[in-house]
């Protein structure tokens, strides 16, 4: 396995670790509605950071974006909005299926759809099947899916042991939302694929290869921001028990506390895709679809590890932890299989 591929896998791991940890600061926010908290973090992660970093990277910010036709920018934006819909459905999936089943089904579907649809759309899926390296990477995707399934099973065992239940369990509604979440969340993978002309243009301007994907986040995350912020603002305006004014009428020290924590959560959310861009840049072009598989499977891996570190599994008993450990090992094996396949 070449050093470039190894570093690509490593940066995807770092990005996934940030994704697995980003919600921790949000949990410490006090006396704010979820909608206010999510909006503040979202403004940081989807608007401020993408714009600020792109302004630093690009020699002429406005000239860069105006150089693309609407036919180039619109698919990138719409796929970003598609991801935004999946992001909202994610929370509803947890509500009706519970954490373990919800995450397992949603992540499993988005892993398959986001990984395999890209080469199908690009018309080179047959090349993957017909080459040894391609078949090896596809095997890695299958093994990763098995690993996600095992971790999901561990979560179910944990919830059963600890008596944790879904907020409003509804299998039919939850499964529909999980499938929708999985499909729509893959919009981020499709957006990255559609944004290749933007990446190439950034490279032509002298932007370092590790950073060429970052300017496209202004458009991608702009699409996601409109969906997420629109959802939050509509609820803040229409739901009687929610009030943006009330949330910002608290003691000044508490407002600062909440803003700082929400900002930190937003920063950590953004960092997952900052390092995703670094990892993506190191993956061979013919296997760039693998970036999504690495990110999603490592997200599940890191989520399990973070849960162990935070002692969330302490009262779950030995069997769930053993199953979780097995699932994590399978995901690591999957990453190695994919790495070997790309090296071939």
Swiss-Prot record:
GO terms for molecular function: rhamnose transmembrane transporter activity; symporter activity. Residues 1-3, 59-73, 122-136, 196-213, 280-289, 344 are periplasmic. Induction: Induced by L-rhamnose via the RhaR-RhaS regulatory cascade. Also induced by L-mannose or L-lyxose. One of its GO terms (biological process) is rhamnose transmembrane transport. It catalyses: L-rhamnopyranose(in) + H(+)(in) = L-rhamnopyranose(out) + H(+)(out); L-mannopyranose(in) + H(+)(in) = L-mannopyranose(out) + H(+)(out); L-lyxopyranose(in) + H(+)(in) = L-lyxopyranose(out) + H(+)(out). The keyword DNA-binding does not apply. The keyword Cell membrane applies. Residues 25-37, 95-100, 158-174, 235-258, 311-322 are cytoplasmic. Its main location: membrane. The chain crosses the membrane at residues 4-24, 38-58, 74-94, 101-121, 137-157, 175-195, 214-234, 259-279, 290-310, 323-343. It is a multi-pass membrane protein. It holds the Pfam family RhaT. Keywords: Cell inner membrane, Cell membrane, Membrane, Sugar transport, Symport, Transmembrane, Transmembrane helix, Transport. Optimum pH is 7 for L-rhamnose transport. GO terms for cellular component: plasma membrane. Inhibited by protonophores and ionophores, but is insensitive to the thiol reagent N-ethylmaleimide or cytochalasin B. It is found in: Cell inner membrane. NCBIfam families: PRK13499.1-1 (NF010021), PRK13499.1-3 (NF010023), RhaT (TIGR00776). HAMAP family: RhaT. Uptake of L-rhamnose across the cytoplasmic membrane with the concomitant transport of protons into the cell (symport system). Can also transport L-mannose and L-lyxose, but at reduced rates. Belongs to the L-rhamnose transporter (TC 2.A.7.6) family. This is L-rhamnose-proton symporter. It comes from Escherichia coli (strain K12).
């Amino acid at each position: 396995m070449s050093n470039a591929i190894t570093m690509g896998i490593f940066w995807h791991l770092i990005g996934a670790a940030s994704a697995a940890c980003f919600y921790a600061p949000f949990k410490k926010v006090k006396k704010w509605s979820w909608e206010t908290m999510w909006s503040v973090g979202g403004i940081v992660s989807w608007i401020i950071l993408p714009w600020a970093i792109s302004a630093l990277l690009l020699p002429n910010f406005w000239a860069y974006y105006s150089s693309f036709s609407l036919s180039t920018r619109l698919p990138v934006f719409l796929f970003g909005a598609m991801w935004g819909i999946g992001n909202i459905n994610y929370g509803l999936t947890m509500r009706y299926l519970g954490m373990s089943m919800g995450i397992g089904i949603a992540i499993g579907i988005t892993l398959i759809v986001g990984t395999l649809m890209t080469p199908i759309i690009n018309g080179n899926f047959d090349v993957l099947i017909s080459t040894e390296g391609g078949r090896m990477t596809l095997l890695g995707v299958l093994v990763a899916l098995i690993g996600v399934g095992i971790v999901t099973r561990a979560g179910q065992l944990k919830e059963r042991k600890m008596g944790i239940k879904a907020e409003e369990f509804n299998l039919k509604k939850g499964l529909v939302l999980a499938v929708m979440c999985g499909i729509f969340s893959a919009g981020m993978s499709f957006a990255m694929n559609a944004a290749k002309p933007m990446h190439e243009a950034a490279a032509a301007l002298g932007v370092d290869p590790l950073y060429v994907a970052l300017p496209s986040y202004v458009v991608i995350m702009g699409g996601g921001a409109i969906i997420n912020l629109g959802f939050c603002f509509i609820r803040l305006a229409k739901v009687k028990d929610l009030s943006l004014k009330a949330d910002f009428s608290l003691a000044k020290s508490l407002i600062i506390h909440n803003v700082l924590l929400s900002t930190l959560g937003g920063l950590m959310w953004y960092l997952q895709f900052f390092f995703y861009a670094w990892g993506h840049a190191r993956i061979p072009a013919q296997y760039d679809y693998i970036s999504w598989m690495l990110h999603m499977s490592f997200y599940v891996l890191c989520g399990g590890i973070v849960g162990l570190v935070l002692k969330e599994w302490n009262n779950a008993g030995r069997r769930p932890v053993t199953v979780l450990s097995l699932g994590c090992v399978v995901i690591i094996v999957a990453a190695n299989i994919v790495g070997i396949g790309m090296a071939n």
